[in-house]
Amino acid sequence: MATHQVDAVVLVGGKGTRLRPLTLSAPKPMLPTAGLPFLTHLLSRIAAAGIEHVILGTSYKPAVFEAEFGDGSALGLQIEYVTEEHPLGTGGGIANVAGKLRNDTAMVFNGDVLSGADLAQLLDFHRSNRADVTLQLVRVGDPRAFGCVPTDEEDRVVAFLEKTEDPPTDQINAGCYVFERNVIDRIPQGREVSVEREVFPALLADGDCKIYGYVDASYWRDMGTPEDFVRGSADLVRGIAPSPALRGHRGEQLVHDGAAVSPGALLIGGTVVGRGAEIGPGTRLDGAVIFDGVRVEAGCVIERSIIGFGARIGPRALIRDGVIGDGADIGARCELLSGARVWPGVFLPDGGIRYSSDV
């Protein structure tokens, strides 16, 4: 199967509530990840696989996507947009774009997954098995937090299981699928439908659909939480996660054009510094994601945290495992630890939040 005869469908309609306050101003797939909108990494992988036609299924802040990617020509793609008037779920989102499909086969992606899967190999697997649906599956250390997808010795899916304390397999749904058009046409239109909880179990129960699982051992991460977002960004910077959108040397830091890093600042752990950001002397950034226009003043320590657009971090502040919203102003010597989230534009005075008594 030639990849140019395949459509790509990317579902990007979610509100990204677990990443608030960052997603109050931008959809999750548009947040800077290793200095680029996250979706750029996925679209670059799609283009590198030879797929040309992409449909973005949008809902939350849809105009942001078209403003960034336009017709897709800058990435070597042809991008079209379909907006949901109300949330339709994963299955409903697929059905909603059916009118834009040009081919009999479509590869569908959840737009918040960072993956290194070989897309051409996945399509070859689908074709060689003459499958109606193929799911990319990954193995995880603790599958109890996920729904499981067991397969038989011929790689055919035998069940779709909800979260359980005693899962029979470590294989989980990786959020990437290959559909034949005749299956997409069976998905109900105009209402919310879950592909995981409704479409796939119904197809399996009917018994007339060949559903296969492609077990993949490449890099995979769901970017839905601050912890995973930070880790995924750092893995891109360090070259652990692949992306055709990132060129050049990978290492402990990625400093984008227009950023200013003072002598004596230490940037490690896959830290990324956005355009126009200023990093003061004596600072220590370890696994930090610094968006464009941020000012980090002297002596700050920022670890495994995300600092939103245009925020200011005052001298000797400590931020660990936190999320700072766009335009927030964190005063000198503040300490924000373990899950702290500061909303956009909030001002914290010098020493306003401390976890220790020394000042």
From Swiss-Prot:
GO terms for biological process: cell wall organization; GDP-mannose biosynthetic process. Keywords: Cell wall biogenesis/degradation, GTP-binding, Nucleotide-binding, Nucleotidyltransferase, Transferase. One of its GO terms (molecular function) is GTP binding. Its EC number is 2.7.7.13. Transmembrane segments: none annotated. Disruption phenotype: Essential for in vitro growth. Knockdown of the gene decreases the cell growth and alters the integrity of cell wall and cell membrane. It is an enzyme of class 2 (transferase). Coiled coil: none annotated. Pfam families: NTP_transferase. It comes from the Bacteria. Optimum temperature is 37 degrees Celsius. CDD domains: NTP_transferase. Belongs to the transferase hexapeptide repeat family. Could be the potential target for novel anti-tuberculosis drug. Catalyzes the formation of GDP-mannose from D-mannose-1-phosphate and GTP. Plays an important role in the synthesis of different glycoconjugates which are responsible for cell wall structure, virulence and immunomodulatory activity of M.tuberculosis. This is Mannose-1-phosphate guanylyltransferase. It comes from Mycobacterium tuberculosis (strain ATCC 25618 / H37Rv).
